[in-house]
Swiss-Prot record:
The gene is hsdS. Coiled coil: none annotated. Pfam families: Methylase_S (PF01420). Residues 350-404 are annotated as: Conserved region 2. Residues 200-349 are annotated as: Target-recognition domain 2. This is Type I restriction enzyme EcoR124I/EcoR124II specificity subunit. Belongs to the type-I restriction system S methylase family.
């Protein structure tokens, strides 16, 4: 009997009661679990968590106020964005805008069943909305509880749903772990290929390798700069990818002609020069299309005898070195000193050697970063499969009184 057939047999003829989330769960504020230190390090042992995409911000050596999730797992819920994570290891919390959610009665409701159901809900996050979401909204949402009058059978159904979804998430986790291993391998070979001894090849400053462009923000008050825009306007939020051919925001030709931002030819390498992300990493990407930048970005078009892909790989390899050399000290937001950036030196071998290096690294790059090939594509397909079955498993008949 297939897993789905077994579940269908379990569900055959059962009643379902839709109960407010606040009735079957309880929450704790993270106040006594908040981290105090800011100097995170990979050699420390206690993770510092956020409910958002980053999840693990770093590791602390603090030993007091540790949430013991290894003994009793918990859902961490961001009270503003509604992002949530399942946690089954000990941790410290970063933000007070977080709820630690647990089940009121494990003999009636499995917390992981609640977690999987939570993730079937569409996001209701609105930019600029500072309303606390758990009490005002999510605690009132109704969750389907099968066989409410038969706790034993209810738990059996919940457990089976959790077991099936755990298998899907485990498959994705295995692929993600393999991808991370390959990325480390790629970074190692990239750094080896791009290492040259003094005197082996010519060294140039970043300012000498090509033409640099800055960015700007067209006036938000001029609708003609933004409405029906077709020109990518790239900002740090678009730099989660290493190859960029689209952006979240677009501007018009009118904006290019009459604002501080200028059109940059295709095949430039862009970097972030002002953002809190610079406290951790220097985001860089190959911009494959003509585009514009906001004021927190810079881009370079290499000179004719320098391959754009070589510079793309080189900046990716030297990112941490560039940050150490060029990041400004002080200031409320991390930023790059342009003078120090442009004076940073990199090795530039002859064009044939550049081509050889690029061909080798491009093959690795496809395996680790391509969303149409390799592991990233497989992970994306597994995630879609998981979401399909998750939504199917929670598709209980919904009464008219439930408006989730």
């Amino acid at each position: 009997m297939s897993e789905m057939s077994y579940l269908e047999k379990l569900l055959d003829g059962v009643e379902v009661e839709w109960l407010p989330l606040g009735e079957i769960t309880k929450y704790e504020q993270p106040t006594k679990y908040l981290v105090k230190a800011k100097d995170y390090h990979d050699t420390y042992t206690i993770p510092v968590l956020t409910a958002g995409k980053t999840f693990i911000l770093g590791y602390t050596n603090e030993t007091h106020g540790i949430y013991q999730a290894s003994k009793a797992p918990v859902i961490i819920f961001d009270d503003f964005t509604t992002a949530n994570k399942w946690v089954d290891f000990d941790f410290k919390a970063k933000s007070s805008a977080m709820k630690m959610v647990t089940s009121c009665d494990d003999n009636k409701t499995l917390l992981k069943y609640v977690y999987y159901w939570l993730n079937t809900l569409p996001s209701e996050f609105a930019e600029g909305d500072h309303k606390r979401q758990w009490i005002s909204n999510y605690s009132q949402k109704k969750i389907p509880i099968p066989c409410p009058d038969n706790p034993e059978k209810s738990l059996a159904i919940q457990s089976e749903i959790v077991r099936i979804l755990d298998k899907f998430t485990a498959l994705t986790a295995e692929l993600t772990a393999e991808l991370n291993m390959r990325k480390k391998q790629y970074n190692y070979y990239r750094d080896q290929l791009l290492s040259f001894k003094e005197g082996e090849v010519e060294w140039k400053t970043l300012g000498e390798i090509g033409k640099w462009y800055g960015g700007g923000t067209p006036s938000k008050n001029k609708i003609e700069f933004w409405e029906n825009g077709s020109i990518p306007w790239i900002s740090p939020k678009d730099m989660g990818r290493t190859l960029v051919d689209s952006s979240e925001d677009y501007i018009t030709e009118e904006a290019v002609l009459h604002s501080s931002t200028k059109l940059i030819p295709a095949n430039s390498i862009a970097i972030v020069v002002r953002s809190s992300i610079l406290d951790k990493v220097l985001p860089s990407a190959l911009i494959k299309v003509p585009a514009t930048l906001n004021q927190d970005m810079k881009a370079v078009i290499p000179h004719e005898n320098i391959l754009v892909k070589y510079i793309y790989h080189m900046i990716g390899s030297r990112g941490s070195d560039i940050l150490r050399a060029a990041k400004k000290t002080g200031g409320s937001v991390a930023s790059i000193d342009s003078k120090k950036l442009f004076s940073f030196k990199i090795p530039v071998p002859n064009i044939n050697e550049q081509q050889r290096i690029v061909e080798i690294l491009d093959k690795f790059d496809t395996l680790t970063n391509s969303i149409t090939e390799g592991l990233p594509r497989e992970i994306e397909l597994r995630q879609k499969q998981y979401e399909y079955y998750r939504d199917l498993l929670f598709s209980f008949p919904k009464p008219e009184t439930v408006s989730n």
